[in-house]
Amino acid sequence: MSGAVCPGSFDPVTLGHIDVFERAAAQFDEIVVAVMVNPNKSGMFTLDERIALIEESTTHLPNLRVESGQGLIVDFVRERGLTAIVKGLRTGTDFEYELQMAQMNKHVAGIDTFFVATAPSYSFVSSSLAKEVAMLGGDVTALLPAAVNTRLTAKLAERG
């Protein structure tokens, strides 16, 4: 059985992320979305909110589960008996950074990374950009799953 992890902060999860999850789920028996905790960052959504939003947005993927993690992603992979890391790439800049990380993960732990080129319709989408556009009153319905859009709108209204 082959399994892979899709790591990230997912603050919040976007349709670009969902596209990568769907494509990874078609290639591996099991996908674990690892919502990684960075103690140096405070996100808009709590860890539990991010997990719930991903779960709600991926109910159509029976071989996908969502967990939290922190520390080295290679430790997360090994602890769960997974075999690979899957990362989405939007731009050449993403590739340069992710290639370095992939080479380090291979060197340190022998774990391979598989890159998925983001669909052109999502190549410009990022969590940060979606939040920024939403904060300025823009329409982000084409960037986010419906549940995420609803929760983001509510969270921005709470903040005033």
Swiss-Prot record:
Family named by the database record: Belongs to the bacterial CoaD family.
Annotated organism of origin: Mycolicibacterium gilvum (strain PYR-GCK)
Protein name: Phosphopantetheine adenylyltransferase
Keywords on record: ATP-binding, Coenzyme A biosynthesis, Cytoplasm, Magnesium, Nucleotide-binding, Nucleotidyltransferase, Transferase
Function: Reversibly transfers an adenylyl group from ATP to 4'-phosphopantetheine, yielding dephospho-CoA (dPCoA) and pyrophosphate.
Record-listed E.C. numbers: 2.7.7.3
Annotated positions binding ATP: S9, F10, H17, G88, L89, R90, E98, Y122, S123, F124, V125, S126, S127, S128
Catalytic reaction list: (R)-4'-phosphopantetheine + ATP + H(+) = 3'-dephospho-CoA + diphosphate
Annotated site, Transition state stabilizer, chain positions: H17
NADP is among the record's keywords: no
Species classification: Bacteria, Bacillati, Actinomycetota, Actinomycetes, Mycobacteriales
Main location as per UniProt: cytoplasm
Residues given in the record as substrate binding sites: S9, K41, I73, K87
